[in-house]
Amino acid sequence: GSIPCGESCVYIPCITSIVGCSCKSKVCYKN
């Protein structure tokens, strides 16, 4: 939840979810 993954999730889900990132406030974050 605190580390930006450098990916947005406005239109599509987080591709970085495979490395533990999740969508919060239209941006993908890890932890």
Curated annotation (Swiss-Prot):
This is a cyclic peptide. Keywords: Disulfide bond, Knottin, Plant defense. SUPFAM superfamilies: Cyclotides. GO terms for biological process: defense response. InterPro entries: Cyclotide, Cyclotide_bracelet_CS, Cyclotide_sf. The keyword Disulfide bond applies. It holds the Pfam family Cyclotide. Disulfide bonds join 5-21, 9-23, 14-28. The keyword Endoplasmic reticulum does not apply. Belongs to the cyclotide family. Bracelet subfamily. The presence of a 'disulfide through disulfide knot' structurally defines this protein as a knottin. Probably participates in a plant defense mechanism. This is Cyclotide mra3.
